Design a protein with these regions (language model features):
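Soluble acyl-CoA-dependent acyltransferase catalytic core bearing the H(X)4D motif
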Residues: 1-191, 197-200
Length: 200
């Protein structure tokens, strides 16, 4: 992770202005995403990451900027808490992994295969556990160490992308059903782009 080269300067890595712009897409059918995943012998997460790569590719084409030939790296929070473990205390338990999205690949099936291969490689690695331990260690030290660690990590990625599994049953607030909950993933360091996916 520390030996990974810094991300190249692209339209995704411009200096931050201090202002946020938000946008969201119409919801996708999770059932259809799962059908695609089964047909391609992958996971729903692979399908969604492939779609994110396609969206970033279209963004590069729309801005007229050359699409990076080696893909775009995104920082992805990787859950380290067992899914069936009861949650006794509030808080997150995740490590960050760097995922390369093949934005240069125009064939969607080939793009999917590359995403799938990248994700399978990460699942076999200890990158998430290492970053979790390092960030925990730096978080206990002086602020300057934590800021330097976050700065180093943020130089390795062009965006943050997270896929949060939501509740499997409808959620109600004061008797009103929540139809389309959404959230925005926080960014740190010099990362200005956040891609948030929520299953509900």
């Amino acid at each position: 992770l520390g030996l990974s080269p810094a991300e190249p300067d692209t339209c995704l890595k411009t200096p931050r202005s201090g202002r946020k712009h938000v946008a969201w897409a119409d919801p996708l059918s999770l059932a259809e995403v799962k059908v695609c995943a089964r047909a391609l012998r992958g996971t729903a997460n692979d399908v969604l990451l492939c779609a994110a790569a396609g969206a970033l590719q279209r963004h590069f084409l729309a801005t007229g900027e050359a699409t990076p030939e080696c893909g775009v790296r995104v920082a992805v929070p990787f859950n380290l808490r067992p899914m069936r473990q009861p949650i006794e205390t509030l808080g997150n338990q995740f490590g960050l992994v760097l995922v390369t999205l093949p934005v240069e690949e125009t064939d969607p099936i080939m793009r999917f295969r590359q995403v799938q291969e990248n994700m399978n490689r990460l699942k076999r690695s200890y990158q998430a556990q290492v970053t979790y331990s390092l960030l925990d260690l730096f978080g206990r030290g002086p602020d300057v160490l934590e800021r330097r660690a976050l700065s180093m990590l943020s130089n390795k990625a062009s965006a943050v992308l997270t896929n949060v599994p939501g509740p499997k049953e409808p959620v109600y607030l004061a008797g009103a059903k929540l139809n389309q909950p959404m959230f925005w993933v926080p960014q740190s360091g010099n990362i200005g782009i956040g891609l948030s996916i929520f299953s509900y």
